[in-house]
UniProtKB/Swiss-Prot annotation:
<dbReference type="GO" id="GO:0004831">
    <property type="term" value="F:tyrosine-tRNA ligase activity"/>
</dbReference>
<protein>
    <recommendedName>
        <fullName>Tyrosine--tRNA ligase</fullName>
        <ecNumber>6.1.1.1</ecNumber>
    </recommendedName>
</protein>
<feature type="short sequence motif" description="'KMSKS' region">
    <location>
        <begin position="229"/>
        <end position="233"/>
    </location>
</feature>
<keyword id="KW-0067">ATP-binding</keyword>
<dbReference type="InterPro" id="IPR002307">
    <property type="entry name" value="Tyr-tRNA-ligase"/>
</dbReference>
<dbReference type="Pfam" id="PF22421">
    <property type="entry name" value="SYY_C-terminal"/>
</dbReference>
<dbReference type="InterPro" id="IPR024088">
    <property type="entry name" value="Tyr-tRNA-ligase_bac-type"/>
</dbReference>
<dbReference type="GO" id="GO:0005524">
    <property type="term" value="F:ATP binding"/>
</dbReference>
<dbReference type="InterPro" id="IPR024107">
    <property type="entry name" value="Tyr-tRNA-ligase_bac_1"/>
</dbReference>
<dbReference type="GO" id="GO:0003723">
    <property type="term" value="F:RNA binding"/>
</dbReference>
<feature type="binding site">
    <location>
        <position position="232"/>
    </location>
    <ligand>
        <name>ATP</name>
    </ligand>
</feature>
<feature type="binding site">
    <location>
        <position position="169"/>
    </location>
    <ligand>
        <name>L-tyrosine</name>
    </ligand>
</feature>
<dbReference type="Pfam" id="PF00579">
    <property type="entry name" value="tRNA-synt_1b"/>
</dbReference>
<dbReference type="InterPro" id="IPR054608">
    <property type="entry name" value="SYY-like_C"/>
</dbReference>
<comment type="similarity">
    <text>Belongs to the class-I aminoacyl-tRNA synthetase family. TyrS type 1 subfamily.</text>
</comment>
<comment type="function">
    <text>Catalyzes the attachment of tyrosine to tRNA(Tyr) in a two-step reaction: tyrosine is first activated by ATP to form Tyr-AMP and then transferred to the acceptor end of tRNA(Tyr).</text>
</comment>
<feature type="binding site">
    <location>
        <position position="173"/>
    </location>
    <ligand>
        <name>L-tyrosine</name>
    </ligand>
</feature>
Length: 418
């Protein structure tokens, strides 16, 4: 099976400009290719991982990746399939975000070894050197307005209003391909299927300006089996930055993937062989309640993104919380595992009587209910049941001098911080 056949078998090929010519290029020699990442935030997220890992698979097959950080295009904003104009970021912000994204990409691509080691480029380096007049003369003249308006990615915005700034975005992305081809012999661009219009602007410019053929391959935008856009947890993006989405939260995200999606996601997001995945699928279908596919997904992706130690910690947090063994975890581990539960910062004037604190922290709705909860054995401090109405919280209840975990019943948690 050649690399293109494997990408197809994994569900990673959505559209190509000329499949036969691309397969020929990929099987006859080394291809230099690129994927672009605009710094629209200070971190990449799971949605980016499809293109990143596809790029990694091609590198493992001997091809040479260029990771393009859009320091210039990030200042403009991509209008593709967006309902409204993006807010423009300052140059300083985009520069800072670009640096963070560079660091994240180095965890997935090999920038050190071999003749196909990855190269990092920033389109600000060439766009900052081009005058507006030169850009219009040397690039703009190759694009008709009719061609630009025909792109599905901007049609909707043409009706509701689009600035010239965003309208010109596709020409900038097209010029990226031309520049990389001219300087580094890059002949293939990879990106999400929503980028098709911008990406083919590059092949158009290559054809008209340099009389060369470029290839485009898009990866699918991933949705779950209900059609919901993938990569969100409770409406929030699942970030690759551990400070924005902890390894534990990422682990839980994968653990909660629906059965109908789990095997498909193993093909897309892991480097397990297709034979290994087929074996996992057989075992998974025989005992879905054991969630083998989800557990494998969680292990593989968290290890890939954050490392083996982070995976082991996420697994340990999961197991200890499930067993109610709060005291077996550090304050930092508890902050990861209980990041979504109510948090109350204890004030110096607060009563440390347990009944009072249950009401103050919003754990019980009233003192009467709080007393009943304590007497009925429904209240746990750091995993230990407390039934003393006169119990006073003390330093002994602080884990690492930072927090106390109170549980009401089986599932209602609150964290007291000091």
């Amino acid at each position: 099976m050649n690399i293109f056949e494997e990408l197809k078998a994994r569900g990673l090929v959505f559209q190509t400009t000329d499949e036969q010519a691309l397969v020929k290029a990929l099987t006859e020699g080394q291809v230099s290719y690129y994927t672009g990442y605009d710094p629209t935030a200070d971190s990449l997220h799971l949605g980016h991982l499809v293109a990143i890992l596809t790029s990694r698979r091609l590198q493992l097959a001997g091809h040479k990746p260029y990771a393009l950080v859009g320091g210039a295009t990030g200042l403009i904003g991509d209008p593709s399939f967006k309902d409204a104009e993006r807010s423009l970021q300052t140059k300083e912000t985009v520069l800072e975000w670009s640096d963070k994204i560079k660091g994240q990409l180095s965890a997935f691509l090999d920038f050190e070894n071999g003749d196909n080691k990855a190269e990092l480029v920033n389109n600000y380096d060439w766009f900052s050197q081009i005058s507006f007049i030169d850009f219009l003369r040397d690039v703009g003249k190759y694009f008709t307005v009719n061609y630009m308006m025909s792109k599905d990615s901007v049609k909707k915005r043409i009706e509701t209003g689009i600035s010239y700034t965003e309208f010109a975005y596709q020409i900038m992305q097209g010029y990226d391909f031309y520049e990389l081809n001219d300087k580094h012999n890059v002949t293939l661009q990879i990106g999400g299927s929503d980028q098709w219009g911008n990406m083919t602007a590059g092949t158009e410019l290559l054809r008209k300006k340099a009389d060369k053929t470029g290839h485009v391959m898009t990866v699918p935008l991933i949705t779950d089996s209900t059609g919901k856009k993938f990569g969100k947890s409770e409406g929030n993006a699942v970030w690759l930055d551990a400070d924005k989405t902890s390894p534990y939260e990422m682990y839980q995200f994968w653990l909660n993937v629906m059965d109908d999606d789990a095997v498909r996601f193993l093909k897309i997001f892991t480097f397990l062989s297709l034979d290994e995945i087929a074996e996992i699928e057989t075992q998974f279908n025989a005992a879905r309640h054991e969630r083998l596919a989800q557990k494998t997904l969680a292990r593989e992706v968290v290890t890939l993104v954050h490392g083996e130690e982070a995976y082991k910690q996420a697994l340990n947090i999961t197991e200890q919380l499930f067993a109610g063994n709060i005291k077996n975890l550090s304050a930092n581990e508890l902050k990861q595992g209980l990041s979504n539960v109510p948090n109350y910062h204890v004030q110096s004037e607060d009563s440390l009587n347990l009944v009072d604190m249950l009401v103050t922290a919003g754990i019980s709705p009233s003192k009467r209910q709080a007393r009943e909860d304590v007497q009925n054995g429904a209240i746990y401090i750091n995993g230990d049941r407390v039934q003393d109405l006169d119990y006073q919280l003390s330093n002994d209840d602080k884990i690492d001098d930072q927090l106390t975990v109170i549980r009401r019943g089986k599932k209602k948690y609150a964290v007291l911080t000091y």
